[in-house]
């Protein structure tokens, strides 16, 4: 069993990005600039945004954090999005999700200029991704592809089961795994809460990508010998022994499942760090105008 070390790979990728940024700046080019909008004080969002700002520093990017209280109006938020769309100094920006109930996430996503949508959530980027055109691929699926590549995991002709059908992970992941490219060319099945024979589907899978948000859902009897298991789940489960009061728990019952796998990602330290690195990669592409002029 090989443990897929997302933390180590993410550090490696950040160093590669930093070296490229140093070259750009040495040639008189502009440092990539990532802006982030954070609404309210959601614990998970605070942690993620802090990690993104820190990653920008390591990569040599300029970063800006714009904060609003959770009672900000939808119109005020959309006005800020439009302002960032028109700010030539900002190469890419994100609006950290989830947003308060009174704000339409979809409306916010669609207001972002797709050329600056480094999260890859805008329908234009999602559409381009699904037909294999250059675009900003959403961060978590992109991070998973990077892990498969760096560990040289074979995907062509393999049976891949994606657990979950969210717009952020499940759907794009399924789409990417069936592209005519590496990593891809897999035979993909998407399972979700309404699926029948979900256990049987998993038992036949060479690759399982678990993105349900249900702690310890994937058990030992669901995984065949030699499978590759990618755990996207990060649920905060209360744990009095931890200083934070919670333990980050994946969708896979790691201790039981790991011995059967050829490759597996841990939680934390697997997919999570790669998500942030993918955002950095997209920001670099935006800074270089590599995808959209």
From Swiss-Prot:
Residue runs in coiled coils: none
GO process terms (BP): L-histidine biosynthetic process; methionine biosynthetic process; purine nucleotide biosynthetic process; tetrahydrofolate interconversion
Species of provenance: Bacteroides thetaiotaomicron (strain ATCC 29148 / DSM 2079 / JCM 5827 / CCUG 10774 / NCTC 10582 / VPI-5482 / E50)
Quaternary data: Homodimer.
Name of this protein: Bifunctional protein FolD
Record pathway: One-carbon metabolism; tetrahydrofolate interconversion
The keyword Transport is annotated on this UniProt entry: no
Taxonomic superkingdom: Bacteria
Encoding gene (name): folD
Family named by the database record: Belongs to the tetrahydrofolate dehydrogenase/cyclohydrolase family.
PANTHER family in UniProt: C-1-TETRAHYDROFOLATE SYNTHASE, CYTOPLASMIC, C-1-TETRAHYDROFOLATE SYNTHASE, CYTOPLASMIC-RELATED
């Amino acid at each position: 069993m090989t443990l897929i070390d997302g933390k180590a790979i993410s550090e490696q990728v950040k160093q590669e990005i930093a070296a490229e940024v140093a070259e750009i700046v040495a040639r008189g080019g502009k440092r990539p600039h990532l802006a982030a909008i954070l609404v309210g004080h959601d614990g998970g969002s605070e942690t993620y945004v802090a990690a993104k700002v820190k990653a920008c520093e390591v990569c040599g990017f300029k970063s800006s954090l714009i904060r609003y209280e959770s009672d900000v109006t939808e119109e005020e938020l959309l006005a800020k999005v439009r302002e960032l769309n028109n700010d030539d100094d900002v190469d890419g920006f994100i609006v950290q999700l989830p947003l308060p109930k009174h704000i339409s996430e979809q409306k916010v996503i669609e207001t972002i200029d797709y050329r600056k949508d480094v999260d890859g959530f805008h329908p234009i980027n999602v559409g381009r991704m699904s037909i294999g055109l250059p675009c900003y691929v959403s961060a978590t699926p992109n991070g998973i592809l990077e892990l498969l590549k760096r560990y040289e995991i074979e995907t062509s002709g393999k049976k891949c089961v994606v657990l979950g059908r969210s717009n952020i992970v499940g759907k794009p992941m399924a789409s990417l795994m069936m592209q005519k490219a590496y990593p891809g060319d897999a035979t993909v099945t998407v399972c979700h809460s309404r699926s029948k024979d979900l256990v049987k589907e998993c038992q036949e899978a060479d690759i399982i990508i678990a993105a349900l948000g249900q702690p310890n859902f994937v058990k030992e009897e669901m995984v065949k010998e030699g499978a590759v298991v990618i755990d996207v789940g990060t649920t905060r489960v209360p744990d009095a022994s931890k200083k934070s009061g919670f333990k980050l728990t994946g969708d896979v019952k790691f201790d039981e499942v790991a011995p059967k796998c050829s490759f597996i990602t841990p939680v934390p330290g697997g997919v999570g760090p790669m998500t942030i690195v993918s955002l950095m990669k997209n920001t670099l592409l935006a800074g270089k105008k590599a995808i959209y002029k």
